[in-house]
Regions:
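Short, hydrophobic/aromatic beta-strand segments
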Residues: 84-92, 153-154, 239-244
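C-terminal motif of bacterial Sec signal peptides marking the signal peptidase cleavage site
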Residues: 18-21
């Protein structure tokens, strides 16, 4: 085991030095001016604005490196033209938010009494202060736990007998996510003639069943993981739901992210934004990838998504692949000479995602359609790195909507007839 560990570490370093020679040594950062990134929502006389600060911006505003202690300020402004006072609920933004006094104390331990008092006064002055009386505009910062790339900002304003909820998906500068590189949300991937907008459910179902079964390698000469996921929605519903339930963007592969991968692989530490390898559909690698990491780099749920030329009642249709990493190993089938090992039960990762999304309140409908076809446990298929997997062979289809939907009101479409409908127990005997 010791010899294998030494070999593995040596191989990782060789792969890293080989690979980083071909990668960008730095990545472009977005303009770091949080006031230029303000997002605003309005509802019945109440206007709410928000912006999430980068590491450098928080240093400039507070004068201390908040990010080093895992703290991230969110700037909030509430203009109340209603007839009643509101209270901003900080736990709605982050259940583990940092009160200003606690955060100031973390940076004042080595300061003298005068400097400590100045720091405490500054943190208190910058903090958002409740309540928000009628006819007033209140602004300030709430100190949250650090996120890179993107942050889901949910703001709950309460009053006697009233609740107003505002949600933002806010980009955080200083982090190069893969979807930034492709500009998947801003660029027109398909011509007007290529886009097909489905309004008939049966036609849409047939189109989903006729999608390719697998991702492939770059040359499309070998099949990989099953395409087992379809998401209908966009920046107003599907992606806020994914982020809110813990999925995070993956970093592009560059020298810095490769080195983080190396150190995390050796130490076993968590890397919430670790890059994923490229897989191919529609002649291109994934448009974006998201992952939900555990406490170490070897274990994570990750999904890759491609924007298709289909629309459903005008909404974007994303085709994807989801699986769960349960370890890592050496391989000759990856340019890095190491790869994550997937859980062979790929349906479990899909089921976990659908269950997560049910709690998002943005999931409106859910269905199964025919996909890759069944691969039983005793006759599994293999992905591109030769990991075996087994599956019932269906695709999970999730329809999102900006309007809240409780779990009890989610519609289960009977597109694919399974015993008990879509809520079918995945027992080992059935495999």
């Amino acid at each position: 085991m010791k010899i294998f560990r030494i070999l593995r570490i040596t191989t990782i370093f060789i792969a890293a030095f080989t690979f980083t020679a071909c990668t960008t040594t730095s990545h472009q950062q977005e303009t770091e001016d949080y006031l230029s990134r303000i997002q605003t929502h309005k509802e019945n006389g109440v206007s709410v604005s928000a912006s999430v600060l980068s590491d450098n911006e928080s240093l400039q505003v507070y004068g201390v490196p908040l990010a080093r202690k895992g703290i991230q300020p969110v700037w909030i402004e509430v203009e109340n033209n209603d007839d009643i006072a509101y209270w901003l609920m900080s736990p709605g933004l982050d259940p583990n938010f940092f009160p200003a006094s606690e955060a100031a104390e973390a940076f004042s331990l080595l300061s003298g009494n005068v400097e400590k008092r100045k720091l405490e006064e500054k943190f208190a002055r910058l903090a958002f202060k409740n309540p928000i009386p009628p006819g007033t505009k209140i602004s300030g910062f709430v100190l949250t736990n650090l996120d890179h790339g993107v942050k889901m900002v949910q703001l709950d304003l309460v009053a006697s007998g009233r609740l107003k909820t505002f949600s933002f998906m806010s980009v955080v500068p200083g982090f190069q996510a893969d979807y930034h590189t492709k500009d998947v949300f801003g660029k027109q991937l398909y011509s007007t003639d290529e886009i097909i907008n489905f309004i008939d459910d049966n036609e849409f179902r047939m189109a989903l069943e006729n999608l390719p079964c697998f991702v492939t390698n770059k040359n499309a000469t070998r099949n990989g993981d099953p395409l087992n996921l379809v998401i209908i929605g966009g920046l107003d519903d599907a992606f806020p739901a994914l982020v809110m339930l813990g999925l995070r963007p993956t970093e592009v592969t560059w020298s810095g992210s490769v080195m983080k991968m190396i150190t995390s692989t050796i130490s076993g530490e968590r890397y919430r934004y670790a890059p994923v390898s490229p897989l191919y559909l529609f002649g291109r690698s994934q448009d974006l990838a998201l992952q939900k990491a555990r406490d170490n780099i070897h274990q994570r749920n990750h999904l890759r998504l491609w924007k298709s030329s289909m629309r459903y009642h005008g909404q974007p249709v994303w085709v994807g692949q989801i699986s769960r990493d349960i370890g890592s190993r050496l391989t000759i089938h990856s340019p890095y000479l190491t790869t994550h090992k997937i859980d062979p039960d790929v349906d479990e990762a899909l089921n976990a995602l659908m269950e997560d999304m049910a709690y998002s309140q943005n999931l409106k409908k859910i269905a199964l359609v025919k996909g890759v076809g069944a691969a039983p446990r005793n006759a599994p298929r293999q992905n591109l790195t030769t990991d075996p997997y087994y599956t019932q062979g269906h695709r999970g289809v999730m329809f999102f909507d900006p309007r809240p939907t409780s779990i009890a009101d989610i519609e289960f479409l009977d597109w694919e007839g399974l015993p008990g409908g879509i809520i079918k127990a995945s027992t080992k005997e059935q495999r």
